[in-house]
């Protein structure tokens, strides 16, 4: 077995050029947000993005939810071993949930890795990289509890128009298939004033959309004793001037209450979109999963949401092949999926995760049976998604243009973005029309539907109806800054986004006033 020392090379003098980095992200939206923090921490420490070139530092932010996450990590590390042998001074860091779980195993399987860090100490990455270079040996640092709330760390957003905002970390649920609570700990809630201050800072930087993140967002407030805190938070965020779109993920059906539905329906900035994880349609399987709701309660939630928000697009998560799942159980899942009419679904084949109660359950379902059921489920959901998308054809929707969503936009002369309900829309740019910038809003008529996206082709080749936004202005200024040319005059008073935002700002008086409405008068000690 080789050692780290065999892979370490002398680093070129810092004066020659800044060291470059690449962050690779696997897993959920929490990981995407974490990677923005890792990127911000690296840039604050003087590293620069490799921008597609071979990087001096490769950081892999891992997921531990499914078995293929392990295979993907070690496959990537095997490839990087050869790259590192010929790339003088290269360093490799592994973080996130799988690193938190496997710890020293990462270094045993891949001794050429320089740094292993966990979910609770992301901010330590630059220090660990420097220590590994100085000492010439791998650095393994895993903490058992949160070192600092991630939103206090520097960040670099992928999308100027949009931002992630963590409202909590960790989870108090005990789902038998899930490893996340063991890796991210018990739920810790941020104070409402801190959350609103971060949203305000994002808006000041040009963002017009935020997504509130938590393992179970609608249990937000458990730490300070307010069961209606999440609904209040939605309303307070919706009052922030300049914030046009609010999304959140993920809620838990057992704790999803009508006050949240009311807040969604009565707050214009909250988008008509809901991600509600089903996991299984079988009550027997839900009980074995320790999902403290049953299928009829789940469908009742969807009915109440659609009563208040008729055009809401509802998405879900479903696991196929949980231990003990029979054909009858699976038929119940198909029944609920047909009744629920999800606009899309994230479907997974059950994967044994050591350390979870489900891993040692009897009656593990054979892989070929799981695969066959998975095929039937995805075929059903694809049909439903197509039918639900076809209902949108002929409607006029507003699309927030993205910089990174459309892979073939250049070949098709289209731009891509998200409708208010979260659906992906590819829209045609007619010859002679102005072209929307990332962050601008475009009003289009949907002309075609596919299972996974909508298309808005120009029927009469008329110019696009573009609403130029502060986010588009911020994107344009950022482009000018990166090219070293003067930025065009801003159309609004909002300043351009810094390349790296250095953590949470201090609160402004107006934000503190808004926060009080969330905290509630019954808990004055928790005011920001």
UniProtKB/Swiss-Prot annotation:
Binding site for [4Fe-4S] cluster 2: 171, 175, 178
Main EC class the enzyme belongs to: transferase
Cofactor(s) essential for the protein: [4Fe-4S] cluster
Boundaries of every Radical SAM core domain copy: 157-387
Primary localization class, coarse: cytoplasm
Keywords: 4Fe-4S, Cytoplasm, Iron, Iron-sulfur, Metal-binding, S-adenosyl-L-methionine, Transferase, tRNA processing
InterPro entries, per the entry: Elp3/MiaA/NifB-like_rSAM, Methylthiotransferase, Methylthiotransferase_CS, Methylthiotransferase_N, Methylthiotransferase_N_sf, MiaB_methiolase, rSAM, rSAM_horseshoe
Annotated [4Fe-4S] cluster 1 binding sites: 28, 63, 97
Record domain MTTase N-terminal: where: 19-134
Cofactor binding, note field: Binds 2 [4Fe-4S] clusters. One cluster is coordinated with 3 cysteines and an exchangeable S-adenosyl-L-methionine.
Domain TRAM span(s) in chain numbering: 390-460
Gene Ontology cellular component terms for the protein in this record: cytosol
Enzyme Commission identifier(s): 2.8.4.3
Any GO MF annotation of the entry: metal ion binding
Keyword Secreted (UniProt): no
Catalysed reaction, written as an equation: N(6)-dimethylallyladenosine(37) in tRNA + (sulfur carrier)-SH + AH2 + 2 S-adenosyl-L-methionine = 2-methylsulfanyl-N(6)-dimethylallyladenosine(37) in tRNA + (sulfur carrier)-H + 5'-deoxyadenosine + L-methionine + A + S-adenosyl-L-homocysteine + 2 H(+)
Summary of the function given for this chain in its UniProt record: Catalyzes the methylthiolation of N6-(dimethylallyl)adenosine (i(6)A), leading to the formation of 2-methylthio-N6-(dimethylallyl)adenosine (ms(2)i(6)A) at position 37 in tRNAs that read codons beginning with uridine.
Known partners and oligomeric status: Monomer.
Sequence similarity: Belongs to the methylthiotransferase family. MiaB subfamily.
Record-given protein name: tRNA-2-methylthio-N(6)-dimethylallyladenosine synthase
Lineage: Bacteria, Bacillati, Actinomycetota, Actinomycetes, Micrococcales
């Amino acid at each position: 077995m080789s050692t780290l020392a065999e892979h370490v090379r002398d680093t070129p003098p810092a004066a020659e050029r800044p060291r470059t980095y690449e962050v690779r992200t696997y897993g959920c939206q929490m990981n995407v947000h974490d990677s923005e923090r890792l990127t911000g921490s690296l840039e604050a420490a003087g590293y620069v993005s490799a921008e597609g070139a071979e990087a001096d530092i490769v950081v892999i932010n891992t997921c531990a939810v499914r078995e293929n996450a392990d295979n993907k990590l070690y496959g990537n590390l095997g490839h990087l071993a050869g790259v590192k042998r010929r790339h003088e001074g290269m360093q490799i860091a592994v973080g996130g949930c799988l690193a938190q779980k496997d710890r020293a195993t990462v270094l045993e399987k891949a001794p050429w890795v320089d740094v292993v860090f966990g979910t609770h100490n992301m901010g330590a990455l630059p220090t660990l990289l420097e220590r590994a270079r100085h000492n010439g040996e791998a650095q393994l640092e895993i903490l058992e509890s949160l070192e600092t709330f991630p939103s206090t760390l520097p960040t670099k957003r992928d999308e100027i128009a949009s931002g992630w905002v963590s409202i909590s970390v960790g989870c108090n649920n005990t789902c038998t298939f899930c490893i996340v609570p063991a890796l991210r700990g018990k739920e810790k809630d941020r104070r409402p004033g801190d959350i609103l201050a971060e949203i305000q800072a994002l808006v000041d930087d040009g963002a017009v959309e935020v997504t509130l993140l938590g393992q179970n967002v609608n249990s937000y407030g458990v730490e300070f004793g307010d069961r209606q805190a999440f609904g209040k938070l939605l309303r307070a965020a919706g009052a922030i001037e300049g914030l046009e779109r609010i999304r959140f993920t993920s809620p838990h059906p057992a704790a999803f209450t009508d006050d949240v539905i009311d807040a969604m329906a009565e707050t214009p900035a909250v988008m008509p979109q809901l991600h509600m994880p089903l996991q299984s349609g079988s009550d027997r399987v839900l009980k074995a999963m320790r999902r403290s709701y049953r299928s009829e309660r789940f469908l009742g939630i969807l009915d109440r949401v659609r009563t208040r928000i008729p055009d809401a697009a509802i998405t879900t998560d479903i696991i196929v092949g949980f231990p003990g799942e029979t054909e009858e159980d699976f038929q119940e899942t198909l029944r609920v999926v047909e009744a629920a009419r999800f606009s899309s679904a994230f479907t997974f084949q059950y994967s044994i995760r050591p350390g979870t109660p489900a891993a040692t359950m009897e009656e593990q379902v054979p892989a070929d049976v799981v695969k066959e059921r998975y095929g039937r489920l995805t075929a059903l959901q694809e049909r439903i998604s197509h039918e639900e998308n076809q209902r949108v054809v002929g409607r006029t929707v507003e699309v927030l243009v993205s910089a990174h969503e459309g892979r073939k936009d250049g070949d098709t002369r289209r731009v891509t973005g998200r409708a208010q309900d979260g659906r992906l829309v590819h829209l045609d740019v007619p010859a002679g029309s102005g072209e929307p910038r990332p962050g601008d809003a475009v009003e289009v008529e949907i002309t075609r539907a596919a299972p996974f996206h909508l298309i808005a082709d120009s029927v009469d080749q008329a110019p696009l109806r573009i609403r130029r936004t502060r986010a588009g202005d911020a994107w344009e200024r950022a482009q000018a800054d990166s090219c070293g040319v003067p930025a065009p005059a801003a159309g609004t008073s909002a300043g351009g986004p810094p390349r790296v935002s250095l953590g949470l700002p201090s609160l402004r008086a107006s934000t503190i006033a808004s926060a009080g409405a969330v905290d509630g008068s019954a808990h004055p000690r928790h005011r920001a």
